[in-house]
């Protein structure tokens, strides 16, 4: 079964982008490479259950088990020892990537309070888009009664685009809600 967002990409986005940019080769048309979700857990040194809860929440959100990131060296001022867990990360590709992005665009982002759209300055100059979320409750899979603490996460959407403008056009065509540019300056 083809994911809904992937079928939109194949049937609507590719012809639209090809018409606008007049690509000479089909491999030049922008596409998604991967989505990386990262969640830092600095307080894991004081509370051992924090790692367990973070892995559970990220597994529910992403649909696959995250990888535990460990400290490479000890830093005494942070009470950090070598090989102590400092974060969890999951990389989504293929259908899981399209399913997650579809849920992010259509379910999670509209549930943010006072959401005005995603910041247009969050592109990195190489055709990738980064966004940070302050809490995991915006995803409908997370049960409010089962969380121990509000935890944020970083999401990196990696594309084959070569510049920020091309990536903006591509993600807008996929349905990402970006902030509108107002004509008056404050």
Curated annotation (Swiss-Prot):
GO terms for molecular function: rRNA binding; structural constituent of ribosome. It is found in: Plastid, Chloroplast. NCBIfam families: PRK00010.1. InterPro entries: Ribosomal_uL5 (IPR002132), Ribosomal_uL5_bac-type (IPR020930), Ribosomal_uL5_C (IPR031309), Ribosomal_uL5_dom_sf (IPR022803), Ribosomal_uL5_N (IPR031310). The keyword Amino-acid biosynthesis does not apply. GO terms for cellular component: chloroplast; ribonucleoprotein complex; ribosome. It comes from Chaetosphaeridium globosum. It holds the Pfam family Ribosomal_L5. Transmembrane segments: none annotated. Part of the 50S ribosomal subunit; contacts the 5S rRNA. It comes from the Eukaryota. Belongs to the universal ribosomal protein uL5 family. Its main location: plastid. Keywords: Chloroplast, Plastid, Ribonucleoprotein, Ribosomal protein, RNA-binding, rRNA-binding. One of its GO terms (biological process) is translation. This is Large ribosomal subunit protein uL5c. Binds 5S rRNA, forms part of the central protuberance of the 50S subunit.
